[in-house]
A protein has these predicted regions:
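Conserved ABC ATPase signature
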Residues: 25-29, 33
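Internal alpha/beta loop-helix hairpins
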Residues: 72, 76, 86-154
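Glycine/charge-rich catalytic "coupling/switch" loops of P-loop NTPases
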Residues: 108-109, 155-206, 223, 227-255
């Protein structure tokens, strides 16, 4: 009933950017446009909870990128919780506040993104481990087209993308660093093109596929993961408690 609606339809239309689609036949809409319209129809009933089961699974990467910002805005703008089911790690990292990981119908672990992903036994396929950092946008270095982001362990430099450039200084950011993009050394590297190197302490080691090792690292109050060869781990005599330097080849801004 109209009197019981908590979500104004006009606000939903504006939030999802579908005003220009309302007069078009569904058959003429792209996959991303159809998904946004479907979300609007669900929200028009003013639900107390929005259940989304693999909502982007049929979309290609471009259409996913089109829809994700709208999904990200819904809980914040409409104050409605979303139960989001997905096998896509990048979607979970982008959207989730609290994650429940299931295997064979049973809860394996749960927690916030940083707690869940920054563990040695995070449960994802070998070679796909990723660490999550919560940070803050500190500065833009216009001359170098770089932005500085601080986290509880130091600072990182990233290319100043349009998404970063549009954010105010001090805004919160979520970053991911794939374990395969982190290398280790026992001494600082001299004369390197790498922008991001941080002192760290090894907190754990485990096998991660044939001839591979996953290392858990404490960087200040934050956690990182490094995916290295078993041979490198042996040559460096890596062990828990050892001080190392983590050299980061890639950082992704996910939120």
């Amino acid at each position: 009933p109209v009197a019981r609606r908590k979500i104004a339809l006009d606000k939903v239309v504006d939030l999802l950017g579908i005003g220009h689609l309302l007069q078009r036949p569904c058959a003429t809409l792209s996959g991303g446009e159809r998904q946004r319209v479907a979300i609007a129809r669900a929200l028009a009933t003013s639900p107390q909870l929005l259940l989304m089961d693999e909502p982007l699974s049929a979309l290609d990467a471009a259409r996913k990128a089109e829809v994700l910002p709208y999904l990200e805005a819904l809980p914040r703008e409409l104050a409605i919780p979303i139960l989001y089911v997905s096998h896509a790690q990048e979607e979970v990292l982008r959207l989730a506040q609290h994650i429940v990981q299931l295997a064979h119908g049973q809860v394996v672990r749960q927690g916030d993104a940083a707690t869940l992903f920054n563990q040695l036994d995070q449960g994802f396929a070998a070679g796909n481990a990723t660490a999550v950092l919560q940070g803050q946008l500190l500065a833009h270095h216009a001359q170098d087209h770089l932005s500085a982001l601080g986290f509880a362990g130091g600072q990182l430099l990233l290319p100043t993308t349009p998404a970063l450039a549009s954010r105010p200084l001090g805004s919160a950011v979520r970053l991911t660093i794939a374990a395969r993009d982190v290398s280790l050394s026992l001494q600082p590297l001299a004369h390197t093109s790498l922008l991001n190197s941080l002192p760290a302490t090894i907190t754990g080691l485990r096998e991660d596929g044939p001839g591979q090792v996953l290392a858990a690292l404490a960087v200040g109050e934050s956690q990182l993961l490094a995916h290295i060869s078993q041979r490198s781990a042996r040559q460096l005599a890596l062990a828990p408690g050892q001080a190392v330097f983590a050299h980061i080849k890639g950082v992704a801004l996910v939120r």
